[in-house]
Amino acid sequence: LDEHYLSHFDYLDVDSVIQEQKAFGACRDVTLEYPVAENEGEEDNTYLSYNMVVGNAADSQMAMAFEVLDYALLSAPGAPLKQALLDVKAGKDVYGSYDDGILQPYFTVIAKGSNPDRKEEFVSVIRQVLGNIVKNGIDKKAVEAGINYFEFRYREADFSSYPKGLMYSLDILGDWLYEKGNPFAQVQQLTVFENLKKAVNEGYFEELIRKYLLENPHGCIMTLVPKKGLAAQREKELEEKLEAYRSSLSEEQLDAMVEKTKALEAYQEAGEDPKALECIPMLKRSDIKREAAK
């Protein structure tokens, strides 16, 4: 690949670093709409979410700690935060997630099947439950169960029908993309699990809740409200935008666009040239070492 292709091009030093979003001065309140069908009800169809940015992609221990918190607070049997929200009927279902596949991971709590007028109570219950946990301590057995659950999954490395090597490479890519920390930390997690087991009795998880879920200005409370006819409205706006763009083009520009489209379709439908395929180097059995690398 290098000898026959890459070596014929000049190296470019491209600034591909993804910049971090600056923290908000205060938690934001956002209301958005999403489309529903005409025969679908709008009542009990709102989504409420409590979202906080937590750390960065390089901190593998914090990432695993928030996975454990998601389990202990919202997924485990009798999870306190989920149960409290269900008790006040904040929504028909409550769940959470932690996403560390981006530069600045976030933790979210979601109430599905709710209404806009439940937002204040939704937020109040979350803060009350989390505040009590910080003050009185988290359920250590639930946290330990979460750590054991994720450690077992890590040791088993059962990715179902997906190749293990592919899944490991995707884990590594999560850190590698952002040029932070050690990319291999994602596949060297045993030390992380040992540290978390010790941290259970050191107030570590309570401090994460206080710092990132209660006193963190970098977050938002989102209300996602259903609206009938929104899909048709957006489609009409897009058609008008495209028609305005089309009207701005000359006949020559339109003809050139048509020709480019035809050329693209012809390229996509054409089969591979056998001679081109023969140029691809094939791995020979003699290229493979008998001994595994140590």
Could you say what each language-model-derived stretch is?
Residues L1, V109-A111, L130-V134:
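Conserved catalytic-core segments centered on acid/base and nucleophilic motifs
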Residues E3-S60, Y71-S124, D139-M167, D171, ...:
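Non-catalytic beta-strand/loop surface segments
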Residues K89-G91, D175, N182:
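Short aromatic/hydrophobic-glycine micro-motifs
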Residues K119-V143, K180-E265:
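Ordered core of a single globular domain
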